[in-house]
Amino acid sequence: MAEIDLSPTDRAILEMLREGRCTPAYIAAEHDYSRQHVRNRLQRLVELGYVERVHKGLYELVQDPEQT
């Protein structure tokens, strides 16, 4: 996978998702981000193959982004 420049917000989201599935609202509350900002970052992480939307408003970390 090519080197991707992740923002500090992206890294914080990925760290939370390493612990398990999360909603944007939960991530936003834990890090004092707006829910919209978290949704935007999650969408980018989905597009990059790091995160998968498993249900409406529920996301999880992709175990191996190379497999997406």
Model feature map: region roles:
Residues 20:
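Flexible coil/turn residues that form the inter-helical turn or adjacent wing/linker of helix-turn-helix
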Residues 26-30:
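A short acidic, leucine-rich amphipathic alpha-helix
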Residues 49:
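Glycine-centered, phosphate/nucleic-acid-interacting loop/turn motifs that mediate DNA/RNA or nucleotide
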Residues 11-17:
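Hydrophobic residues on short alpha-helical segments
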Residues 2-9, 23, 53-68:
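Short, cationic-aromatic polyanion-contact patches
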